[in-house]
Amino acid sequence: MEGQMQHVVLKLKNLLNIEKDIYFEIFNIEEEKSEAIIKKSGKVIEELSVSQERLLNKIESLEKERIKLMEEYSKHRNVLHHGNEITLQDIIDTVDAKSSSALKLAGIELKKILLKVKNIQDVNSQLLKDNMEFYDILISGLKNSSTLRSGYGRDGKEKGRVFNPVLFNIKA
């Protein structure tokens, strides 16, 4: 039984490290997105988002596995946990010093990369918001510079003409 639980702890540590590596890839994609946002390259942003979505699907699968491992460990070791779900700290508190140190380090490194990802996502969100505001202002200015003049010709038909017309591609 003890060997089986050590195996679960080792598997959990490896899982955390795999998640950390995937989040590092996500961080790199977010950095590329920053450049694409600045260059206003929608196609690149879309391609990066598709890649990122695949990685997030992997993370979701790993998270399910991690929760399952933690619950299995908790059940076999009668781990007391605070709240409804078992935390990594709950497991760290019950394992030997070497395993505790390894799990704690894996958890800390995962948390560091998660914070980096969150920070760069916040920056990218602000960049996108700023770009949208810029385009809203630009479009408003262009709309205001377009006018419609109309009158009637000798034949009684209305003649309408737009001066300074602005054409928009609604699919863009």
Where are the regions a protein language model picked out?
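Short hydrophobic/aromatic-rich motifs at helix boundaries and adjacent loops
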Residues: M1-Q6, G107-K111
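Extended, charge-rich alpha-helical scaffolding segments
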Residues: E2-D93
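Short terminal interaction segments
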Residues: N84-A172
